[in-house]
């Protein structure tokens, strides 16, 4: 029996210096997410948006640790963690709508409270900077490093997810890395699948390996879908677009592979970085909605 999906909005842009992603949850809902999931046979409940305080001039203010709005990010992620934890304990699948990618810290921490798990990270970026290595100070470039306790995050209990096993993490579709990120990732036990590897081997084989990595020896996995994983020609409404991303059909094929896994093994899922200000006729939010419904089991036949 398929589990109910609990939709949770996290309208935050603390993790980026570009405004607009805080409107992502509204844009995705406007694209008909709830109705499409219902039509696919999934029961849903939408708890609305979690409270996110607004800060005047937030795009200019940074903390001494070179991680902008880290305290505000912590507060939001702790709210997300509590809601996701309750969702998992209720036997439902938490579907987190971002917001910038820093929200993943809350989602994964909430989902790992039950037992250890893996993660498949669909992203153009590594998200593996730390406050001391980040060239921008934007926390949306740090969530994976934060969850795995790298650098200063090792002392931040709210960020570090001890139940996320590094050897069970796979990043899919990477095509741009900072120098320090590249070094840290090479030294880690994370499996990194670049777009070049997808070009060479084919997406189906790469995603199969990523899912195998995420589920090896654990009973659950998390899916983090950053919409900049896709090529900006089909997903223009993202904050940090990078050319050469996944095509429309590749993205759906990947999400369909996620859906082929045992329903009980999908611990949580999030879709992030939809920026309606930069979008064209809500195209990116529409695509996000389609991909989420594919990941949760929608079928043509």
Residue ranges of model-derived segments:
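Conserved alpha-helical scaffold segments that buttress catalytic/binding sites
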Residues: 2-301
């Amino acid at each position: 029996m398929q589990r109910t999906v609990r939709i949770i909005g996290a309208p935050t842009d603390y993790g980026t210096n570009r405004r607009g992603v805080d409107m992502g949850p509204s844009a995705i809902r406007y694209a008909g997410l709830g109705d499409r999931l219902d039509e696919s046979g999934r029961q849903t409940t939408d708890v609305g948006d979690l409270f996110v305080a607004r800060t005047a001039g937030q795009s200019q203010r940074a903390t001494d640790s070179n991680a902008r709005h880290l305290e505000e990010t912590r507060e939001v992620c702790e709210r997300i963690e509590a809601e996701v934890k309750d969702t998992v304990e209720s036997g439902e699948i938490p579907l987190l709508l971002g917001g910038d990618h820093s929200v993943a810290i809350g989602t994964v921490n909430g989902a790992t409270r039950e037992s250890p798990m893996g993660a498949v990270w669909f992203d153009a970026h590594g998200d593996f900077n730390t406050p001391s290595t980040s060239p921008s100070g934007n926390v949306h470039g740090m969530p994976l490093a934060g969850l795995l306790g790298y650098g200063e995050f090792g002392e931040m209990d709210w960020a570090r997810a001890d139940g996320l096993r590094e050897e069970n993490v796979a990043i899919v579709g990477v095509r741009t890395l900072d120098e320090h990120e590249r070094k840290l990732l090479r030294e880690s036990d994370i499996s990194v699948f670049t777009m070049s590897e997808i070009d060479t081997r084919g997406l189906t084989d790469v995603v199969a390996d990523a899912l195998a990595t995420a589920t090896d020896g654990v009973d659950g996995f998390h899916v983090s879908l950053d919409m900049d994983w896709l090529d900006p020609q089909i997903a223009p409404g993202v904050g940090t677009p990078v050319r050469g991303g996944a095509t429309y059909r590749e993205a759906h094929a990947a999400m369909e592979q996620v859906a082929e896994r045992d329903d009980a093994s999908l611990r949580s899922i999030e879709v992030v970085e939809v920026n309606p200000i930069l979008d064209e006729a809500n195209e990116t939010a529409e695509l996000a909605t389609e991909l989420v419904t594919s990941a949760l089991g929608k079928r043509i036949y």
